[in-house]
Amino acid sequence: MSRRGTAEEKTAKSDPIYRNRLVNMLVNRILKHGKKSLAYQIIYRALKKIQQKTETNPLSVLRQAIRGVTPNIAVKARRVGGSTHQVPIEIGSTQGKALAIRWLLGASRKRPGRNMAFKLSSELVDAAKGGGDAIRKKEETHRMAEANRAFAHFR
């Protein structure tokens, strides 16, 4: 038995304005070079643009977008007998949300547009409607997992 205590599970803090953990997770992923105030500005501007575009609660659009992009299953490279197989594995909710946020930010960075707030708001609205690059990435991951279903027993 190990002598070390078990690490306490970290809970994500909520942001100051919306009091939402998802917004804080988004801020921490968009953060570059420790400029957290700039990250907050970008997120809040994006949420304001979503409010103007859709005339609905931006948090519900954000939740819907993340729910739509969150994958249930992913593939993991596993080396078996000299060859590497892509083994499908199930993903937990926390890891799925983290992946979804990463994909949303990656897709919004690749978008053409004026600034990051505009690109992020457009990507979130598209993802909430069921379109955009992040949704395509999720579907591609699910297709990969389905194609490699034969290797599921290598888990």
Curated annotation (Swiss-Prot):
PROSITE patterns the record matches: RIBOSOMAL_S7
A GO molecular-function annotation: rRNA binding
InterPro entries: Ribosomal_uS7, Ribosomal_uS7_bac/org-type, Ribosomal_uS7_CS, Ribosomal_uS7_dom, Ribosomal_uS7_dom_sf
Domain of life assignment: Eukaryota
Subcellular location: Plastid, Chloroplast
UniProt xrefs under Pfam families: Ribosomal_S7 (PF00177)
Keyword Protein biosynthesis: no
Any one biological process term the GO annotation gives: translation
Gene Ontology CC annotations of this record: chloroplast; small ribosomal subunit
Keywords: Chloroplast, Plastid, Ribonucleoprotein, Ribosomal protein, RNA-binding, rRNA-binding
Main location: plastid
Protein's job: One of the primary rRNA binding proteins, it binds directly to 16S rRNA where it nucleates assembly of the head domain of the 30S subunit.
Assembly, per entry: Part of the 30S ribosomal subunit.
Family recorded in the similarity comment: Belongs to the universal ribosomal protein uS7 family.
Protein name: Small ribosomal subunit protein uS7c
Gene that encodes the chain: rps7
